[in-house]
């Protein structure tokens, strides 16, 4: 019995030593995580995005650090990849973030970054510089961006990003209308009258206040004329006459804030 008691005492003593050792190790890991996080944030604030990405990814691969700063690490990585022009990577990380933190208080910020990433994917520096109209380019990223900003306005009406989101929505809606007008012109050149009429009808439904929709009406009138539908042609002519004095506001592209 005495040997057993001695053995139990030795085991308990050993567990106590191990417990203290584990506690010290955890405290050291926490301090290390805090130091690395501070370093990564400093790199991010200085615009050294490549180094910040490397630091945040290093933290994300360690359990203690990932548990302590997991959400903030992912937010910072989304932002850093956006700033380096890696928009598809930013979108991928954002999608992962939404799955991992569905109840995050930063969800409006994530949707805002996703929207800006999609806008950037629809941009082209050279075409911007020479004022080239991009309405005929693939419009998918623009539609996605509109949906991202619309989500902020609808679901997060108190968000600090609502005003910016609304401005982007006006601009993007105009871009989509311009794209539809380019398709109408394409069909008109090929005398595809039915396609012209169908497309303009969609514009009247989805972009009724757009200048591009008004500019599409003469193509619709001509299409009805080609098809010999005089009543429909006359109705469109009347619609054109009613709106000929209408002044459309100039829609300019919102500026990216310095932060983004």
From Swiss-Prot:
CDD domains: BamD
Keyword Iron included in the entry's annotation: no
Annotated signal sequence range: 1-19
PROSITE patterns, per database record: PROKAR_LIPOPROTEIN, TPR_REGION
The keyword Membrane is assigned to this record: yes
Membrane topology type: Lipid-anchor
Subcellular compartments: Cell outer membrane
Family: Belongs to the BamD family.
Assembly, per entry: Part of the Bam complex.
Protein name: Outer membrane protein assembly factor BamD
Organism: Haemophilus ducreyi (strain 35000HP / ATCC 700724)
Chain's gene name: bamD
